[in-house]
């Protein structure tokens, strides 16, 4: 297991109370040896005006996953901040849920890179993101 902090899924989800994460309905669903996953509903909260998943909502899910994964890689007295987010949208989603899968690309002492892939309910890739974070403290 790569994580330096050990939290349960319930504890991870509790951190989202009264935040954008909760407003968008994002729920952490899996914390594996080197993977963090979450789901987000595709509904009125996350739609753009034409009834499709808003790219900004996809980006919010990606940044949520990458930032929390980055936090889990820090020690006491440290935190992470996002420095760059890139998102490539591959396929439209109009309903259901999307699942985000976050994996490390680089875990340095001062910076990290994460790949976050979003999948629709049929398991099709709908968005690929990369998040860069800086380790502070």
Curated annotation (Swiss-Prot):
Keyword tags: Cytoplasm, Hydrolase
Predominant place of localization: cytoplasm
EC class (word): hydrolase
Localization per Swiss-Prot or TrEMBL: Cytoplasm
Gene Ontology BP terms: enterobactin biosynthetic process
EC code: 3.1.2.-
Entry's family note: Belongs to the thioesterase PaaI family.
Function of the molecule: Required for optimal enterobactin synthesis. Acts as a proofreading enzyme that prevents EntB misacylation by hydrolyzing the thioester bound existing between EntB and wrongly charged molecules.
PANTHER family assigned to the protein according to its UniProt record, in alphabetical order: 1,4-DIHYDROXY-2-NAPHTHOYL-COA THIOESTERASE 1 (PTHR43240), PROOFREADING THIOESTERASE ENTH (PTHR43240:SF9)
Designated name of the protein: Proofreading thioesterase EntH
Species the sequence originates in: Salmonella enteritidis PT4 (strain P125109)
Record gene name: entH
